[in-house]
């Protein structure tokens, strides 16, 4: 068992859904990131996804792209993110999942990269541009260090691909709720509910849904569809830019209350 699987097992035993906020490290600066991470943990985040700023973030929408640009302009690099994580790790009970792209991993080499993020206290890793066909080796090396490589399923994934990803996935399965890049959407695709059922037919691994969840109503809807986790990114990045750390804390409380609220039986 890993920290992430333990977290989901505990939540499942309580009949609760995980809240998984996302922040871009170093936006607007590393000290603000530190305070925001502590606030998220304090206000009920079950896991926290921390984005490593990257110059060509293909999977990210305009909000997170802009956050990455601000962080890079402020001088934030991977080593800075890892130093921050190592420093703050003992103060945060929630598992931390790093979100990065292939290039930084390839530049350092699988083993060196994973040694470094493990030493910093990372529990999971999301690499959105990593092809499934090339993920097995990285997943194995990560698992040796207690790190779960989180794999993504898209609305366009075929049944065979869903089965292959579900089999190989560690920690939880990241279900992308909409096609395209990250960002807030006004409406969620009902295809997500069908995909959740389809994935569940082949695995009992936890499923987190992300991309496009902007507020309490959507988060509750995703929970009601049967997701084990709700991943919220652009809304937190926006809130941090507009209202600072206190705004992030308020949004976390709102989402926590929304997904913990029991559905009304008709």
Swiss-Prot record:
Cysteine disulfide links: none
SUPFAM superfamilies linked: Ribulose-phoshate binding barrel (SSF51366)
PROSITE patterns: TRP_SYNTHASE_ALPHA
Keyword Nucleus: no
Cited Pfam families: Trp_syntA
GO annotation, cellular component aspect: cytosol
Pathway in which the depicted protein is active: Amino-acid biosynthesis; L-tryptophan biosynthesis; L-tryptophan from chorismate: step 5/5
Top-level taxon of origin: Bacteria
InterPro entries referenced in this protein's UniProt entry, alphabetically: Aldolase_TIM (IPR013785), RibuloseP-bd_barrel (IPR011060), Trp_synthase_alpha_AS (IPR018204), Trp_synthase_suA (IPR002028)
EC number(s) on file: 4.2.1.20
Family indicated by similarity: Belongs to the TrpA family.
Function noted in UniProt: The alpha subunit is responsible for the aldol cleavage of indoleglycerol phosphate to indole and glyceraldehyde 3-phosphate.
Name of the featured protein: Tryptophan synthase alpha chain
Taxonomic source organism: Synechococcus elongatus (strain ATCC 33912 / PCC 7942 / FACHB-805) (Anacystis nidulans R2)
Gene name in the database record: trpA
